[in-house]
Structure formats: structure tokens, C-alpha cells
Amino acid sequence: MTIRWQAAAPALVLVLLAACDAPVEPVETPSEMRFSEKPPIALNVARVEIEKMDTGERVDHEVLAKFAVPPDEAMRQWARDRLQAGGGGTGRFTILTASVEEEKQPPAKGAVGWVGPAPGGRYTITVEGRLEILGEGGQRGMTAAKVARAKTLEGGLTADERTRALYDLTLATMTAFDEQMERGIRRHLNPWVF
């Protein structure tokens, strides 16, 4: 007994559609990024100001919306968690760069590109910050750090999986920034560290 292709096509379509509706396990992504697992860096300053330098660079809000914690928020939280005031003078932490670049991969060619998974992309996060100390007696000190990290995400990720992967990329970038900045503080701002 032979089955004609035309008769089997609707059944095949239903089977394929049912396979597409398989349940997807949610991926947990924290809604904030904290740096309080390490002790704060106690500075001999009365307060620590946090500001962001306006570089005039274009911000792609569509790309930033993919991040549970955008890089500029992560940098502000780093300064709040890691820099502790306790003396005289002023500390000023300036966010010089907190950018994300997205390079989209082209969709697959042919029918796969029309119905296949969404294409992936390469994401590059660059963060740069500067800490200045303005002492009561007019002394000044400064250190800075700049870190860039990139990751290519494969196509077909769920929105939750992509958000988690970008969170992990942000965390890796900020972990490297934290290490560089702490080294710089201890090396160049040691007179103001308790």
C-alpha cells in the first residue's frame, strides 16, 4: 500500500508543529549584580561620588534591553559595594565607558533561514572607570582600569538562555574590572586606603 505525498503532508506538518511546542525549562538569571562577597575597600575619604562621563556615544537601547544588568548599572553597583568612605576628602568614581556592541550573525540561507532558529551574535562589553581621590590637604591620586570581554552566542537560544549568557558575560567583565581596579587602588592610592 502506497501513501501519496499529498495525503501525508498535513500529518507531517502537524508532527513538526507539535515538536516545536516542546516545553522549555526556564533559565534563572539574577536581576541584580552584587560585589559584596569581597570586603569593601576602605578609603580615607568622607564620601565617594559616582558619576558617568557623557561621551556622546550612541546607545542601542534594543541591545541593552537584552541585559538583565546593563554594564553601567553593574559599574555603579561595583562602586557602591566595593568603595567605602571613612575619613576626610572626596573620592570620585567616574564611569568612562560602559558599552555593548552586538554583531548579528546573518540568518541561514534558504528555507532554514525562514523557519529555523534565530541567528546568534557576538557581544562585546567594554567597561572603563577612574577613581580619583581629592585629599583635604590638596593631595590628589588617581587610578583607572579598562576591560573588554566578548562572547559569541549560538543561534536558537531562548530569550532566558540569551539573558543568562549575557549576564555571565557582564559578570566576567566586571570580575576582571574589579581585579584590575583593586590592584590599581592598592598600588596608586595606597596612602588613602585604610
Per-region residue spans from a language model:
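Beta-strand elements of well-folded, non-transmembrane domains
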Residues: 83-85, 97-99, 129-137, 149-155, ...
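Short acidic, glycine/proline-rich loop/turn micro-motifs
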Residues: 60-63, 105-108, 157-159
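Short acidic, glycine/tyrosine-flanked loop/strand segments centered on an H-E-D-like triad
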Residues: 46-57, 136-162
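Bacterial Sec signal peptide processing site at the extreme N-terminus
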Residues: 14-38
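Surface-exposed short loop/turn segments
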Residues: 89-142
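N-terminal segment of the mature soluble domain
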Residues: 41-101
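Sec-dependent bacterial lipoprotein signal peptides
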Residues: 1-20
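C-terminal/domain-edge helix-coil "capping" segments
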Residues: 157-194
